[in-house]
């Protein structure tokens, strides 16, 4: 399911047998219709960014619901897929903040300790938030609670009202929160543009004696 250390830590914050409930939900969802991302990528964020290496969290809401977009990492799409509007705005802010990045696949961020997590890990094709409130929120809230327990600092990047509600789980004074409106076209001009989350994150990490993220990689 997830990287083994993640698995054990997350489990401690969930009701008994919750993993079984998740597997049952996935069996039914994928058997009954088209669901994104592909099932083998549902837990990709936790598989490619081990707990012990996680130093940044970028929290999304749910996967992209169009064909071939979702790959299990928040805001990221495969290289050959056109960037959706929110990702276009993220890359625009990155260009203004640090420099231009031409590719849409954010896997290289994940491999540097940036956990690209969605609050819901699946979505029915064409139905934004179609799986919201059914199974995922206790699981992904548990991920945030696990990160809150880390001794080493984590930078939590929270974009939009939904993500910012998760501040309630971030109580460890060692950690840092960067928040702004969401990068979607509806809210990007209300404070996302100009918020400089990437340079601010690196400044925090370097002040803590940690290596910054190569956001342009």
Swiss-Prot record:
It is an enzyme of class 3 (hydrolase). Gene3D superfamilies: Uracil-DNA glycosylase-like domain (3.40.470.10). Keywords: Cytoplasm, DNA damage, DNA repair, Hydrolase. GO terms for molecular function: uracil DNA N-glycosylase activity. The active site is at residue 62. It catalyses: Hydrolyzes single-stranded DNA or mismatched double-stranded DNA and polynucleotides, releasing free uracil. Pfam families: UDG (PF03167). It is found in: Cytoplasm. Belongs to the uracil-DNA glycosylase (UDG) superfamily. UNG family. This is Uracil-DNA glycosylase. It comes from Streptococcus pyogenes serotype M1.
